[in-house]
Design a protein with these regions (language model features):
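Cytosolic, long alpha-helical scaffolding segments
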Residues: 1-237
Length: 237
């Protein structure tokens, strides 16, 4: 009976891991497509990004239901319980990453397609590449329960913040130089902030991995270098 229970619990954990991996892959694709849509002012692709978020949301709900049901049925303790709590936390962060990609896509739909700030866009592309690397590496660390790799992601967040700070100053300069730039620059400010927040969620996942493996919350303060005053306000029609 005990062996059967253990096998059933292992199957539950494997199914949660599979759903987390699928969710992570979808979130990564959303980010890449959102950046492409922003670069090309491609409203059709932006709408695809918005529509794709429904699957990410659905997976998050399935993971939540599965994890809670498993806790209720199996009454796990110690590392087994932390694995389930970790799955809940990671799925929540991935769902938020998907929402942030969707917010960028929503802005693409209303941005002026005639204006372009190539230097700023290169900075946004660079920050997106950094964040995608963070997400890929932290998901690999989650799958392997690799604390050392998770901590590399945790420390890398400062570089993302530094790029965001630079973009913030640059966009403010463009707005002060020419009022015609204000609308576009405002949208790009929020796009950059959304990407920076994705990095924060990758850092959250790194902290969750530490908790899952070590059994306690990471004691050190998070390395933050974000000095912008822009808050993350989702764009809504």
């Amino acid at each position: 009976m005990m062996e059967h229970t253990l096998k059933a619990f292992d199957a539950d954990l494997q199914e949660l891991a599979r759903m987390i991996a699928e969710m992570g892959g979808l979130a990564e694709r959303q980010i890449g497509d959102a950046l492409d849509a922003l670069n090309r002012r491609d409203t059709a692709l932006a709408r695809d990004v918005i529509a794709a978020d429904a699957r990410v949301d659905s997976l998050q709900r399935q993971i939540e239901e599965k994890a809670i049901l498993t806790i209720a049925r199996r009454q796990p303790m110690a590392v087994d319980l932390r694995d389930l709590v970790g799955a809940l936390r990671v799925s929540n962060d991935l769902e938020r990453i998907g929402d942030l990609a969707k917010n960028i896509a929503k802005r693409v739909e209303v941005m002026d397609s005639e204006l372009s700030l190539q230097k700023v866009m290169r900075g946004i592309e660079h920050m997106t590449e950094l964040v995608l690397t963070q997400i890929k590496e932290v998901l690999d660390a989650y799958a392997r329960r690799d604390v050392a790799k998770a901590m590399q992601v945790w420390r890398a967040d400062e570089e993302v913040d530094a790029v965001n700070n630079s973009l913030f100053r640059e966009l403010l300069t463009y707005m002060m130089e020419d009022p015609r730039n204000i609308s576009l620059c405002t949208h790009l400010l929020f796009c950059a902030k959304n990407i920076e927040r994705m990095g924060d969620h990758a850092t959250n996942i790194a902290e969750t991995i530490y908790y899952m493996v070590e059994g306690y919350i990471l004691p050190d303060d998070r390395p933050k270098g974000d000095h912008t005053s822009t808050t993350n306000i989702p764009y809504r029609n």
